[in-house]
């Protein structure tokens, strides 16, 4: 089983080797039996979608306030990753994410944040930090499509903590291997803007794919629980 480490070495090298990316395979479920015109019963197959994996909301939302770029609103999905969502809300409400950077930006793939070491003036330390504890994996069949939010890990089972990534371009090679816990419902254009910033692709001043010279800062993450100021509800 392949994992995205907290600090990915290189763009997609050693992570999603092109020859190893699997095509998206839809899940097929038996929807039920229908009576045909001739009176015979025929089985009808229904493709299971991402929407079938979650219950109807409202869900809690996390709003990432990105300095100079705007807000990213994430719908959290506790029914597919309850412990991951609970941990993310806890860290956000404690102010853990305030001042943390998006330290990895790979256009067409993902943007990654959540490392407290990204506040350190020495960028060589960036990529391996966390909250000081680890949480269990909560893998599901929810696909890693554009805007999906998933938990990063250290390359081992049950090694996530605080680092997360937002999918920029559909990445089926990650499906079932990382804990999806949310999806962007507003501000995907901010995600797009982050992928357009200048990055240190050669690692001259720290890890590769780190925004440089202008960092992408999360000023705050605010949690809006169900029925509390969530747009559209």
Residue ranges and their predicted role:
Residues 2-3, 34-233:
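Cyclophilin-like peptidyl-prolyl cis-trans isomerases
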Residues 8, 29-32, 227:
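N-terminal regions of proteins, emphasizing targeting and processing segments when present
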